[in-house]
């Protein structure tokens, strides 16, 4: 049995634990969240859990002007799904704990996974967990700005396509950002949702299940009870 910590060190450990917890707690951004009932420009976004990975789906017609030009094959898609992750782990045809560990400690770069959908998310992914979230126009634009910034660009400012994606009409693109044990694909989704102004805590979103829990609890708004737009 180890020796007990001196009292002052025990207080220090407890204080650090409290500080870490408080650092993870966030508040709503009042200029973006919550959306107002009846406000012009409210949008619906969808959060999708595929098991290990989560993604964000937006209506293409509402988003395309704020995103980099993507492949022409996506021009007819009604919706776009975005996910982010380690290039080795995300692009692998099968998930494994070995690949996950390698990504966590020695990532070789990151990618964005973009999927073109013709049907609404719940229909396109009948076996996935899907949460629909209403966001304000300011929150929607801030979220899309973060997604756009995640694309690594070529000298002409275009997105850098890497090849076909994992399912459907999808493609991988070279991405910005560093993947590590404390910042995973699910952390990225939570941080991107945070741009809508909702009080989701990215530091807690290490798993797909936590992303969905927080999205459902903190980001979903009952507009029937929301304050009306002025």
Residue ranges and their predicted role:
Residues 12, 48, 228-230:
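Amphipathic, soluble alpha/beta structural segments
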Residues 21-24:
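C-terminal motif of bacterial Sec signal peptides marking the signal peptidase cleavage site
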Residues 27, 149-230:
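Activation targets extended, charge/polar-rich intrinsically disordered C-terminal tails
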Residues 30-48, 59-174:
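Non-catalytic ligand/cofactor/substrate-binding and regulatory segments of enzyme domains
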Residues 50-52:
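A short, compositionally biased
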Residues 55-57:
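Short beta-strand scaffold segments in enzyme catalytic cores
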């Amino acid at each position: 049995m180890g020796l007990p910590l001196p009292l002052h060190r025990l207080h220090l450990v407890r204080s650090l634990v409290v500080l870490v917890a408080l650092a993870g707690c966030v508040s709503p951004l009042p200029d973006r969240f919550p959306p107002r009932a009846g406000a012009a420009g409210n949008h619906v976004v969808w959060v999708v859990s595929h098991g290990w990975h989560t993604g964000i789906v937006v209506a293409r017609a509402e988003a395309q002007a704020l995103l980099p030009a993507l492949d022409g094959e996506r021009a007819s898609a009604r919706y776009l799904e975005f996910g982010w992750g380690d290039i080795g782990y995300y692009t692998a045809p099968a998930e494994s704990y070995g690949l996950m560990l390698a990504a966590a400690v020695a990532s070789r770069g990151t990618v964005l996974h973009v999927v073109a959908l013709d049907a609404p998310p719940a229909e396109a992914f009948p076996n996935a967990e899907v949460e629909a979230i209403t966001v304000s126009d300011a929150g929607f634009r801030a979220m899309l700005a973060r997604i756009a910034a995640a694309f690594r660009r070529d000298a002409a400012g275009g997105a850098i396509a890497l090849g076909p994606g994992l399912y459907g009409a999808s493609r991988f693109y070279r991405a910005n950002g560093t993947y590590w044990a404390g910042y995973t694909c699910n952390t990225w989704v939570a941080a991107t949702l945070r741009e809508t102004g909702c009080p989701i805590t990215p530091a807690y979103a290490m798993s797909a299940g936590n992303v969905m829990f927080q999205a459902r609890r903190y980001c979903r708004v009952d507009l029937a009870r929301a304050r009306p737009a002025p």
